Amino acid sequence: MREMNERMMKVAVGKIEKEAIKLVSIEYLNYMIEHPGVYETIQWAVWHGTEETATIFNNYLSLLTTLIQSCSLNKDKTLEILNMLTGTIHGYTTLQLGNAFSAPDKVRFELAEAIDTLLVGIFQKYK
């Protein structure tokens, strides 16, 4: 999970707002594609892990929170936006991971489209 977080932070450097959020989302999926079986392990660790795994997961949430807050959206809705974003990223990864192994470019593109659509709604509602 640490490596995944580092990769997500790296792709966000120098990017802003929607672009950074989309790149981080795709990098999350990329990591799962490149490391079969890790997604399931991460989910188990988040649910049953230690204080250390909780800290690592919270670093992931902190990155997304920072990116959300950089978007000049309603600050009072940050947690609500974070929940929508993580729900989309995790849900999409869960449902599409099997397809991603055989058609990774298609799945990456479709995740980017899903995130774009979500962000359009978020920016319309919470700006």
List each language-model region with its residue ranges.
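Hydrophobic alpha-helical connector segments
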Residues: 6-37, 75, 82-85
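Short amphipathic alpha-helical/adjacent loop interface patches that line ligand
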Residues: 1, 25, 36, 61, ...
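Amphipathic C-terminal alpha-helical segment
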Residues: 38-44, 87-104, 119-127
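Solvent-exposed, amphipathic alpha-helical segments
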Residues: 3-11, 88-95
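Amphipathic alpha-helical packing segments from all-alpha helical-bundle domains
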Residues: 5, 47-73, 79-83, 109-120
